[in-house]
Structures are given as structure tokens and as C-alpha cells.
Amino acid sequence: RDRIQVLVANVDVIFVVSGLDGDFNLRRLERYLAVVREGGAKGVVLLNKADLCPEAPRRLAETILVARDLPVHVISAKKGEGVDVLAQYLTPATTVALLGSSGAGKSTLVNRILGREKQATKETREDSRGRHTTTSREMFLTPGGAILLDTPGLREIQLADVAEGL
């Protein structure tokens, strides 16, 4: 439990995916962003499941304050809403990793970007907690030539030697 685990390496962009449903947690998002900033990759915040959240505008405003200089996009991976804006990050030879808690919709987003069902997905439980359907990291080549790395959902994230993001 006390050991440090490397989440991803050699990536250009990290999509930090947070569900706008019951998964939304601003403090956890701050921890993700601190880790991203410390790691040196370009961070992009994706607020997913916009179709399930009537409070999306308020949560977007809160997230923009926390994200500071990082871009924030509201999307619905399941319905395809807002996903087209991600093409600017998915350029040829760019490696993009997805980070977020279980149930945030990372694998659904992978399927949407790839244009086909490559990753198994499940409905989120009634309490909005994920089911850990993705259990290992997996790489995919996108139609535009980017490398997309899907990662298992994280139950928790703690900061280790992160100075810049605090």
C-alpha cells in the first residue's frame, strides 16, 4: 500500500475523465490534475456523461477553476456529444492516455473514438460507482493515427512527492 505505482509513461496527452453523474468529485479531480502536472504530459479534462447531469454548467464552472490553464470539455461518450473536439489531441504519432475512476466512461470513450466496440463496458451501478470492467492497460491505434491507452479505473489516487501541483 505504501509503494508508488507508475500509472502511465511516455505519453503526450492525458485525458482525465470524470463522470458528471454521482462519480463527480472535485477534490479527487484536483489530485488527478496534480499528478498530471507533475508528470509533464499535456492534461485535458473531460467531463463525461453530460446527458445524465442537469448540473453540468455549474460543475463545468467549478472544474474550470480547478483546472486553471488546462482545457476542459463536456462530453457524452455514450451519445457522441462533444467528442469531435477531441480530434485536436488525437493527432498522428501522439500517445494519449485516459485516467479516471472506475465508471467514469473511459472505455465507452475509447469505443467512441475508435468507431467500434473494442472495449467491454457495463452500465454504471445505481450508486454511480464503477464495476472495474477494464482490468489492464490496453493500447489502440485510432483512425487518425494516434495511440490511445485505456487504463483501469482508479479507486483512489494519492500524491507522492508532488510539489508543483500543491
Which residues fall in each region the model found?
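Helix-rich effector regions associated with P-loop NTPase G domains
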Residues: 1-14, 18-20, 25-27, 34-43, ...
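Canonical P-loop GTPase G-domain recognition
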Residues: 42, 49-104
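Walker A/P-loop
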Residues: 102, 107-108, 112
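Charged helix-capping and loop-helix junction motifs
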Residues: 29-33, 58-60
